[in-house]
Amino acid sequence: MDGKQSEITIREALASESAIILHHRRSMFRDMAEGTVEELDRMVEVAGPWLARAMADGSYHHWLAVDEADHVGGGGGVLLCPWPANPRDPCTQRAVILNVYTEIEFRKRGIARQIMLTILEWIKAQGLRGVNLHASAEGRGLYEKLGFEATNEMRLKF
């Protein structure tokens, strides 16, 4: 990219663009120093077929940030999971935001915020009443500014 900032458009990703989604997922974990090269390669190998199925059945939606030259500068997605209703939320689906990533040369331009606002509007339009995500240290400030709060979630790894 030259020094000029291009106009960014956020658009829904096509299933044929799964390679860029997987590239962003791998880059996200690499940037957080999560996983060895071999583990990241295996993750992409396993995630590819899952992503194709999830995009085909509508359980995963992804958006890309593209500039005027159609360079992809980032993206983010949402996974819709079956979930039992509870007293405060009668919905039987839960939305989980995943894979929010901005390429290094596109950072500090508000692109992650644009992606998140697009995803949040889409989730609201589906009639869902909330959304979860796991925040990296880099993303936590943005998510807090958007109104996300820490919860009482716990995890056990095997």
Where are these regions (language model features)?
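Conserved GNAT-fold acetyl-CoA-binding loop/helix
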Residues: 29-50
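Conserved beta-strand in the GNAT
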Residues: 64, 71-80, 96, 101
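Conserved GNAT acetyl-CoA-binding A-motif
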Residues: 123-135
